[in-house]
Design a protein with these regions (language model features):
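Hydrophobic alpha-helical positions that pack around
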Residues: 1-101, 113
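Ferredoxin-type iron-sulfur electron-transfer modules in oxidoreductases and energy-metabolism complexes
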Residues: 2, 143-265
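Extended, hydrophobic alpha-helical segments in both membrane/secreted and soluble proteins
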Residues: 105-108, 121, 185, 199
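Short glycine/threonine-rich loop-to-helix capping motif typified by GTGT followed
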Residues: 17-20, 100, 131-142, 203, ...
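Short amphipathic, charge-patterned alpha-helical segments
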Residues: 101-117
């Protein structure tokens, strides 16, 4: 027997980070802690604390009732079991789907989610939520599991599969993602607090046809000074769409520079 208490959070994205979540539960400001000590050693109210996502807890009854071997028989050799995939974006049937790990991403997009809407074609997809690198359409046959997605250059993340069709300019998509992380930054770490704003301002100028070609290099330089330099991965999350969009869709950026009058450069 055990007691379950639920607490309604204020909706801050940063509180998805485990130590920021602990601060919030204690009534403090939602911002990450220095680690170590890790929560399993010193967590909620300085007590050892185990933190799990709801999806992890949901598979426990199946494993207890059916056995670990039956659960491990699902999926790939290294990625066992199933994954809840939240498909959004330019698909005919957005929604939540449970798939066996290793299912081809193409099958999720075209069979389960009904394919690309409005007769358009797939341009890109973000496999595991906005914090994971976007991939071009030619990677759509990759298996939806941790190892295969990593080999393709991204991460499975939260399983939030975002589908982008060919009506979209990737620079605009990138700006929207940067805007989200700029808003959700708790401001504790300088690289994140300042870096997200710099990225937003530069990409915005590019979209306003006020940028210069070297702005692309400047974006990559700023990203290099943000990644792995903060208390939590929010800065890395903001860097992800910028770096991956430049890598796979540099031409979308360069298209804006063709519109700039020579006298304005």
């Amino acid at each position: 027997n055990l007691d379950i208490h639920t607490h309604l959070g204020a909706g801050a994205y940063i509180c998805g980070e485990e130590s920021a979540l602990l601060n919030s539960l204690e009534g403090g400001r939602g911002e990450p802690r220095m680690k170590p000590p890790f929560p399993a050693v010193e967590g909620l109210y300085a007590k050892p604390t185990v933190i799990n996502n709801v999806e992890t807890l949901c598979v426990v009854p199946y494993i207890v009732n059916e056995g670990a071997e039956k659960y491990a028989a699902l999926g790939t050799e290294k990625s066992k079991g199933t994954k809840l995939v939240s498909v959004s974006g330019h698909v005919k049937k957005p929604g939540n789907y449970e798939v066996v790990l290793g299912t081809p991403t193409r099958e999720i997009i075209y069979d389960l989610a009904g394919g690309i809407r409005d007769g358009n074609k797939l341009k890109a997809f973000i496999p595991g939520g906005s914090s994971t690198p976007m991939l071009p359409a030619d990677k759509v046959d990759v298996g939806y599991d941790y190892e295969a997605i990593a080999e393709a250059g991204s991460m499975l993340g939260s399983g939030a599969l975002i589908v982008i069709d060919d009506s979209v300019n990737i620079v605009e998509t990138t700006l929207r993602l940067i805007s989200f992380y700029m808003h959700e930054s708790c401001g504790k770490c300088t690289p994140c607090r300042e870096g997200t704003r710099w990225l937003y301002q530069i990409v915005e100028r590019i979209m306003q046809n006020k940028g210069q070609l070297e702005y692309i290099d400047k974006l990559e330089d700023i990203c290099g000074n943000m990644a792995m330099k903060t208390f939590c991965p929010l800065a890395d999350a903001c860097v992800s769409p910028v770096v991956s969009s430049i890598k796979h869709f540099r031409s979308d950026y360069e298209e804006y520079f063709k519109k700039i009058p020579v006298s304005s450069v």
